[in-house]
Amino acid sequence: ESRGLGDVYKRQLYVCSELFVGNNNFELIDQFKIKQIRIVKLSKKVFNSLSYRDKPDGILSLFITKKLTIEDFNLSGPILVADSIEKPGNLGTMIRTARAFNFLNIISADGVTDIYNPNVIRSSIGHIFNINIFSEDSEETVSVLKKLNYDIISLDPFSEKSIKSYKPNKNYALIVGSEQYGISDIWKKNAS
């Protein structure tokens, strides 16, 4: 059962078997059928006109999303906060890296990048569907994290404190800064 992308509902799956590249495409289609998701078969020409990619692999899904906020989640455990990340591929990479370390919650704080961007989804290699991810402004995020007694750990290479000296408790938020500007002042001021 998927948890991620907040509250996402799969509605339709569009397929073009002429474009399939993997061996598990029919298994995936069967899983959608079991969940009573509508399967729409398309010609190669029509599929290519709908796809975001230059060389699509024959499967395209349509989602209806619901905007969620930090209050919509029962936060516990480590949280990755992506502060003003600009490039969708970088956000997707952070998602899959966070999952490798068992993070279940990711906040895109003051997000420049749309968390539903196809490049975010693709570069997360599917892990976006196994996490809670949402966008929120930094001030609200700091406020909620403090109310929940979270340690705020800024990954700042110019910090006087070393990450090596930190002994995490159960609830901590790891802050990763933007590609160009690093960590915002609000996160530096509120770091543990």
Give residue ranges: language-model regions.
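RNA substrate-binding interface of SAM-dependent RNA methyltransferases
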Residues: 12-16, 40, 71-159
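Short, aromatic/basic amphipathic alpha-helical patches
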Residues: 23-35, 187
